[in-house]
């Protein structure tokens, strides 16, 4: 059931990034402006990608544990732990989504 989520385009880390290079070319007249910068950590996109993948993995584990519990292969404690972990991941994803939507709405309300 949860495998259908992988097909969503919103989870693609590089979707929409192809137009960035053409935009910077048009802004800077074809010249590449380079400034020395140091990568101090993971990018925001990679962090969000990792969080979403962890959430999907937790949901998959909970789904498998639920099916095993129904079949009698897993005890109740394992099923409850997996479901609670999946619920926590889902709540984190919902909170993150709400913060992103709130930030977007704040930006759209700003005057130019």
Swiss-Prot record:
Its main location: other. One of its GO terms (cellular component) is bacterial-type flagellum basal body. GO terms for biological process: bacterial-type flagellum-dependent cell motility. GO terms for molecular function: cytoskeletal motor activity; structural molecule activity. Keywords: Bacterial flagellum. InterPro entries: FliE. It is found in: Bacterial flagellum basal body. Pfam families: FliE. Belongs to the FliE family. This is Flagellar hook-basal body complex protein FliE. It comes from Agrobacterium fabrum (strain C58 / ATCC 33970). The gene is fliE.
